């Protein structure tokens, strides 16, 4: 008896062609990692260029004391553009931040036009100034830990952020940490 079986990969996402689903997932991963690099470099306008016009950004943390979500920042793309223009005029901590992002999941919708991603992040702060700058300057410390919950619109092979919820595990943000995380 001669039986032949053909092995085919199951579709990665509903009825979407597997190659298209892989390309869309790669575009999402590229957008997440590119966003990390641009945020580290404080290239705010280039970071916003990765975002759709209807982009919404949130920084939140769960508070067990009040049994409620705390919202540190909520804004549209227009709100973030204004924030980025104004922040250099504020008293800010100029210590650079370095993010380490690890993508957990990328789920491309059946039609291939939208996707969701979940990533973990760790942010290190490299101290330059502050109350104890004579002691702390030059030190690097763990600053934030959390997850990104992103949604995307995929157009012409590129993934544009339509929302990012930055969900913090820690609940203390220092002075001058108003920049997008």
From Swiss-Prot:
MSAMO is inhibited by metal chelators (such as bathophenanthroline, bathocuprione, neocuprione, alpha-alpha-dipyridil and sodium EDTA) and by sodium azide, sodium arsenate and potassium cyanide. The keyword Transcription regulation does not apply. It catalyses: methanesulfonate + NADH + O2 = sulfite + formaldehyde + NAD(+) + H2O. InterPro entries: NTF2-like_dom_sf, SnoaL-like. GO terms for molecular function: methanesulfonate monooxygenase activity. GO terms for cellular component: cytoplasm. It is found in: Cytoplasm. Induction: The msmABCD operon is induced by methanesulfonic acid (MSA). Gene3D superfamilies: 3.10.450.50. It holds the Pfam family SnoaL_4. The MSA monooxygenase system consists of 4 proteins: the 2 subunits of the hydroxylase component (MsmA and MsmB), a ferredoxin (MsmC) and a ferredoxin reductase (MsmD). The hydroxylase component consists of a 3 alpha (MsmA) and 3 beta (MsmB) subunits. Belongs to the bacterial ring-hydroxylating dioxygenase beta subunit family. Methanesulfonate monooxygenase (MSAMO) mediates the primary degradation of methanesulfonic acid (MSA) to produce formaldehyd and inorganic sulfite by initial hydroxylation of the carbon atom prior to spontaneous cleavage of the unstable hydroxymethanesulfonic acid. MSAMO has a restricted substrate range that includes only the short-chain aliphatic sulfonates (methane- to butanesulfonate) and excludes all larger molecules, such as arylsulfonates and aromatic sulfonates. All MSAMO components are required for enzyme activity. This is Methanesulfonate monooxygenase hydroxylase subunit beta. It comes from Methylosulfonomonas methylovora. The gene is msmB.
């Amino acid at each position: 008896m001669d039986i032949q079986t053909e092995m085919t990969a199951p579709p990665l996402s509903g009825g979407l062609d597997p190659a298209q689903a892989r390309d869309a997932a790669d575009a999402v991963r590229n957008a997440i990692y590119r966003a990390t690099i641009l945020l580290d470099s404080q290239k705010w306008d280039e970071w916003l260029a990765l975002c759709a016009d209807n982009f919404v950004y949130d920084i939140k943390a769960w508070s067990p004391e009040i049994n409620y979500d705390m919202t540190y920042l909520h804004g549209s793309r227009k709100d973030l553009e204004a924030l980025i223009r104004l922040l250099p005029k504020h008293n800010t901590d100029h210590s650079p931040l370095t993010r380490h992002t690890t993508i957990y999941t990328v789920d491309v919708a059946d039609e291939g036009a939208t996707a969701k991603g979940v990533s973990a992040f760790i942010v290190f702060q490299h101290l330059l100034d502050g109350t104890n700058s004579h002691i702390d300057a030059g030190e690097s410390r763990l600053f934030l830990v959390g997850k990104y919950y992103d949604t995307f619109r995929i157009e012409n092979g590129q993934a544009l952020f339509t929302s990012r919820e930055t969900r913090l595990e820690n609940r203390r943000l220092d002075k001058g940490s108003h920049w997008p995380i």
